[in-house]
């Protein structure tokens, strides 16, 4: 039966402290990448939800405006179909009052829709920063990992710069 050899060193990196440092840095970059990716996904989801709520408000606004228009047309039609104003005065007053009520409601609905639009724009901006940060972190992870194949130190240098940019963009995305 053959004997099993157990190597305690990690291949040819056992004495290479720089490789160990790069390995730890790659792990840290991976953790930061995971956090930024989750933040990016959440920002995109929030933007979609806000956009949906904004669209709902605009649909509600349009429905109220349509009702207002129908009441205005009804009042005009009632006036035009009779020569006796006293017969339609109550109907016209009712329609005019309801139309004014819808006009007031639409102002508030429009205000809410515009606020949702601002929230959507803010979330979309956050998502873009986080997406770009995610891309730089991925680039940093890959470039740093190339050290293990090439033993060239400029790969981790480029990788750390890219990861630094990605981290800054990620932080900006979270703080926005």
What kind of region is each of these model predictions?
Residues 1-43:
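Internal alpha-helical transmembrane segments
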Residues 6, 17, 21, 139-176:
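Juxtamembrane interface at the cytosolic side of transmembrane helices
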Residues 15, 47, 123-125, 144, ...:
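Hydrophobic alpha-helical segments, principally membrane-spanning helices and signal/leader peptides
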Residues 17, 24, 33, 118, ...:
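Residue-level detector of functional hotspots within protein domains
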Residues 37-127:
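Cytosol/matrix-facing amphipathic helices and coiled-coil assembly/linker segments
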Residues 41, 51-52, 133, 144, ...:
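Surface-exposed loop/turn and secondary-structure junction residues enriched for glycine/proline
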Residues 67, 75, 134-137, 141:
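Hydrophobic side chains within alpha-helical segments
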Residues 125-139, 153-156:
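N-terminal membrane-entry
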């Amino acid at each position: 039966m053959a004997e099993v050899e157990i190597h305690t060193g990690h291949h040819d990196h056992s004495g290479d402290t720089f490789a160990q440092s790069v390995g730890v840095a790659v792990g840290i970059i991976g953790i930061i990448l995971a956090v930024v990716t989750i933040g990016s996904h959440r920002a995109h989801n929030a933007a979609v939800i806000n956009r949906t709520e904004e669209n709902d408000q605009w649909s509600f606004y349009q429905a109220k405006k349509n009702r207002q228009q129908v009441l205005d047309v009804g009042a005009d039609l009632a006036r035009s179909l009779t020569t006796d104003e006293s017969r339609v005065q109550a109907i016209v007053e009712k329609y005019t009052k309801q139309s004014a009520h819808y006009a007031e409601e639409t102002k508030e609905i429009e205000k809410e829709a515009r606020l949702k639009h601002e929230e959507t724009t803010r979330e979309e901006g956050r998502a873009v920063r986080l997406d770009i940060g995610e891309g730089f972190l991925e680039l940093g992870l890959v470039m740093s990992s190339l050290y293990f194949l090439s033993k060239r130190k400029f790969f981790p240098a480029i990788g750390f710069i890219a990861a630094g940019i990605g981290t800054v963009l990620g932080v900006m995305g979270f703080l926005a």
